[in-house]
Amino acid sequence: MRVAEWNPWHGCHKYSEGCAHCYVYRRDAKYELDASVVKKNAAFDLPVRRKRDGSYALKGPDDVATCFTSDFLIDEADAWRPEAWRMMRERGDLTFFFITKRIARLAAVLPEDWGAGYPNVSIGVTCENQRMADERLPLFLAVPVRRRLIICEPMLTAIDLRAHLCAGIAQVAADVGATWSAGP
């Protein structure tokens, strides 16, 4: 399975300890860009772009890494996010996944037709230490999401996830290369 990348917006603000060495800030600095400026990208509509023959430019069934140069839940994207959700819903043949540190905002910005979650959207929450795991994971588990991922990256300290692991977690990954999966 191929993984396509879709960055509907770019830029972020350092949010917690895990952001100290953010790759987006490092990469943007090489090109003298300000990574703290959040802006809508020219590729915003990539999932629904069509070729001359009318077919979608992005072919399914691809996984689509979404918003890896920003945070999908960043405040500045509130005006654009409803259209991003609409495109995800339209492209049920693609599987979108995004990772966020701002999980506290998720319930407030879900689309009205979200229900138990779109079947083609996976959401991951980043927990870089025990404090962030204990703060973010209960919020994450309280919101309806069909496929949940816990990402311990960058893993700044040891993290005990046992209190948060349940049938609702599809996968856990850590930046040391270890991965746990709930099943197929």
Regions found by a protein language model. Give the residues of each.
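Conserved Radical SAM active-site core
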Residues: 1-16, 20-121, 130, 159-170, ...
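Histidine/lysine/aspartate-rich catalytic loop segments that bind and position anionic ligands
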Residues: 125-129, 133, 138-178, 182-184
